[in-house]
Amino acid sequence: MTLAFQLAVFALIATSSILLISVPVVFASPDGWSSNKNVVFSGTSLWIGLVFLVGILNSLIS
């Protein structure tokens, strides 16, 4: 269970780092938002899901 929690936290940190870099790049590019809207929404949905997963796993471990 601890390994699953650690992997979920690592995935959350990695996803946060990727979104931190990619979202401003998408907004700054001339045609970026209209062509990459689905990718940004998918990444945001993944991030929200990982936040809830980490919270659930944390309550099971503690």
UniProtKB/Swiss-Prot annotation:
Protein name, as recorded: Photosystem II reaction center protein Z
Keywords: Chloroplast, Membrane, Photosynthesis, Photosystem II, Plastid, Reaction center, Thylakoid, Transmembrane, Transmembrane helix
Originating organism: Lactuca sativa (Garden lettuce)
A biological process from GO: photosynthesis
Family: Belongs to the PsbZ family.
Location of this chain's protein in the cell: Plastid, Chloroplast thylakoid membrane
NCBIfam families recorded: PS_II_psbZ
Quaternary structure annotation from Swiss-Prot or TrEMBL: PSII is composed of 1 copy each of membrane proteins PsbA, PsbB, PsbC, PsbD, PsbE, PsbF, PsbH, PsbI, PsbJ, PsbK, PsbL, PsbM, PsbT, PsbY, PsbZ, Psb30/Ycf12, at least 3 peripheral proteins of the oxygen-evolving complex and a large number of cofactors. It forms dimeric complexes.
InterPro entries the UniProt entry points to: PSII_PsbZ, PSII_PsbZ_sf
Membrane as UniProt keyword: yes
A GO-annotated cellular component: photosystem II reaction center
Gene: psbZ
Summary of the function given for this chain in its UniProt record: May control the interaction of photosystem II (PSII) cores with the light-harvesting antenna, regulates electron flow through the 2 photosystem reaction centers. PSII is a light-driven water plastoquinone oxidoreductase, using light energy to abstract electrons from H(2)O, generating a proton gradient subsequently used for ATP formation.
Pfam family, one: Ycf9
TM segment ranges: 8-28, 41-61
Topological category with respect to the lipid bilayer: Multi-pass membrane protein
Gene3D superfamilies: Photosystem II PsbZ, reaction centre
